[in-house]
Design a protein with these regions (language model features):
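Membrane-embedded alpha-helical segments of integral membrane proteins
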Residues: 1-62
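Active-site recognition of the HExxH zinc-binding catalytic motif
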Residues: 29, 247-259, 263-266, 270
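Perimembrane helix-loop junctions in membrane proteins
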Residues: 51-65, 69, 122-136
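Membrane-interfacial, low-structure loops and terminal tails that flank and connect transmembrane helices
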Residues: 54-100
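Internal/C-terminal transmembrane anchor helices
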Residues: 99-126
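Membrane-interface segments at or immediately adjacent to transmembrane helices
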Residues: 123-193
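Auxiliary, metal-adjacent structural segments of Zn-dependent hydrolase domains
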Residues: 168-238, 242
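Post-HExxH zinc-binding segment in Zn-dependent metallohydrolases
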Residues: 260-291
């Protein structure tokens, strides 16, 4: 697929899925994409177990026909002949086989639809030119300037200093953990919308990020957030520390605007958080750079 076509798709077609389908899935208080994963596991498990049952039933029927045919030939004193099939197969087994074939055909269609959705909402986005090639989020002055090691060192020190200063302003409990009553999900959504006012590529509708019910599983995979192409949702791991949540949520929301590369999403998440008036979001932005 040509980068030009991919870019056209992201600019003119991909936003339609978020504006329509994303609004529908956004009405649900839970992650629709996560429920789809559960359903997929159940459908696959049923197909496997059903197939095993079919194999066992066929094997038992085959053995019984062989034994019956052997006894019949022995009773006539003749040589062993090929046992007859067809009518000896139970009717319920034939019905079960037909149902299994229909179910398998249904799953083939499901897999085909899944592949189509993954192509349109994920794989195709990887063909889009990078933000560097498109010269997004960069001023002409910065583009013409060459940065050396001294300037990068100064930037590093500035990030660390700002993170340390913000750390002192965070509200903490008796154990020293940072606490906040801020609605991080809605704030992340608002910050991305504000960023969209500055950069047209990020403008438009943003659904509210969803919490993952199986956060423990995602923690084992070292996953802080997940973009579900099947439901156009931004999801996040509720077990991550509170200072990681703002940058993670903005990161996942950026995927809904066609920025599928992780480093680009990290950068956009940083921009959204560092420009926020909420100190927790600013702190999360600087920590995401340090990490």
């Amino acid at each position: 697929i040509s980068p030009q076509f991919a870019q056209y798709y992201v600019n003119h077609i991909f936003p339609l899925w978020v504006e329509s389908y994303g609004r529908v899935t956004g009405l649900f208080p839970f992650s629709v994409g996560e429920m789809m994963l559960y359903l997929g596991v159940v459908l696959a498990a049923v197909w496997i177990l059903w197939g095993i049952l079919e194999g066992v039933v066929y094997g038992v029927s085959y053995v019984r026909r062989r034994v019956k045919g052997t006894k019949h030939e022995q009773s006539k004193g003749k040589g062993v002949k090929q046992p007859q099939t067809g009518s000896s197969v139970p009717g319920w087994n034939r019905s079960l086989c037909r149902a299994y074939r229909k179910y398998s055909l249904f799953l083939i269609w499901v897999v085909g639809i899944v592949c189509l959705i993954m192509t349109l909402n994920c794989f195709l986005l990887y063909q889009v030119p990078t933000i560097t090639d498109r010269k997004l989020f960069i001023t002409q002055e910065a583009e013409e300037h060459t940065y050396g090691a001294a300037e990068l060192t100064k930037l590093r020190d500035e990030v660390v200093e700002k993170a340390n200063a913000l750390a002192l302003k965070m509200e903490r409990d008796e154990k020293g953990y940072i606490v906040s009553d801020l609605d991080i999900e809605e704030t992340a959504r608002q910050e991305m919308m504000s960023l969209g006012e500055m950069y047209p590529q990020l403008s438009g509708y943003y659904p509210k990020p969803k919490r993952l019910k199986t956060s423990a599983f995602f923690s084992q995979q070292y996953i802080m957030g997940y973009y579900f192409p099947f439901s156009m949702e931004a999801n996040y791991n509720t077990m991550i520390y509170i200072t990681n949540q703002p940058a993670t949520l903005c990161h996942e929301l950026s995927h809904l605007k066609g920025f599928i590369l992780e480093d680009e999403a990290n950068f956009i998440g940083y921009l959204a958080c560092v420009g926020s008036e909420e100190e927790l979001f600013q702190y999360s932005a600087y920590l995401s750079v340090i990490a």
